[in-house]
Amino acid sequence: IIYPGTLWCGHGNVSSGPNELGRFKHTDACCRTHDMCPDVMSAGESKHGLTNTASHTRLSCDCDDTFYDCLKNSGDKISSYFVGKMYFNLIDTKCYKLEHPVTGCGERTEGRCLRYTVDKSKPKAYQWFDLRKY
């Protein structure tokens, strides 16, 4: 399913090429960049010492953070709002990044950790992290 007025926002894309964007160009450009993230983990794939047990692809936190910021700064306020709500709030997903071992959660909201506590005395390793709410 692709969000109306876009070619890249949803499962896959329906564009005829990498330069084609839908009516909501700003939102679509955010989705296109997100779709082209160089560090992704498909469902069932193992990478960086982690296994994606979700039924959908998960991305590096860098790519998800860039997507979040892009949507927030989009000129297409309504479409970016709905795409952001769908991806960050409705899909229960996580991202991964290289960080010192997580020891707990310093701040939590709506079941998601907003601020992690880490053990800086130990080496960094790839771990799963909750996405921010949109």
From Swiss-Prot:
The active site is at 34, 64. Its cofactor is Ca(2+). It catalyses: a 1,2-diacyl-sn-glycero-3-phosphocholine + H2O = a 1-acyl-sn-glycero-3-phosphocholine + a fatty acid + H(+). It is found in: Secreted. Keywords: Allergen, Calcium, Disulfide bond, Glycoprotein, Hydrolase, Lipid degradation, Lipid metabolism, Metal-binding, Secreted. InterPro entries: PLipase_A2_dom (IPR016090), PLipase_A2_dom_sf (IPR036444), PLipase_A2_His_AS (IPR033113). Disulfide bonds join 9-31, 30-70, 37-63, 61-95, 105-113. PROSITE patterns: PA2_HIS (PS00118). GO terms for biological process: arachidonate secretion; lipid catabolic process; phospholipid metabolic process. Its EC number is 3.1.1.4. Ca(2+) binds at residues 8, 10, 12, 35. GO terms for cellular component: extracellular region. Expressed by the venom gland. One of its GO terms (molecular function) is phospholipase A2 activity. Glycans are attached at residue 13. Its main location: secreted. Binds 1 Ca(2+) ion. It comes from the Eukaryota. Belongs to the phospholipase A2 family. Group III subfamily. PLA2 catalyzes the calcium-dependent hydrolysis of the 2-acyl groups in 3-sn-phosphoglycerides. This is Phospholipase A2.
